[in-house]
Amino acid sequence: AWSADGGETWTGWRIVDILPDGPQDRSYGCFAGLVRLPIAGRDILLYSNCDSPAGRKRGTVWVSFDGGKTWPLKRLVWKDPFQYSSLSAGRPGTASEGWIYMHFEGRLPQTRVARFNLSWLMDGEPTGDGAVPKIGSR
């Protein structure tokens, strides 16, 4: 989707059924995280949210290798209570380069930060929504 007015209106949007927005039995979302990885020549997006029909738990990251058209891979990051996540990618040329950070609420009042990389995500579970490309030495 694209917005030319700061998010007031959107064009080209669509619902992506493979990506949950919070508990699947509710009509409200759970503030998912989304980030584009700063990798030259690639359009890799990551999405984080809970992946459980039984409520706010199973914090999972989904991976898209084609700018969000498909989401062929996911990996569980946190199995316990999980909500309100945000994602950020390390900056090139700094000590954080190559790292992905996920900040989220666990069991209240706890907040947590998970740190992982794309290689770790590549060992995730196929979703059936598109193909997983070979990255690096894979």
Regions found by a protein language model. Give the residues of each.
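Asp-box/BNR beta-propeller blade signature and adjacent active/binding-site loops
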Residues: A1-R138
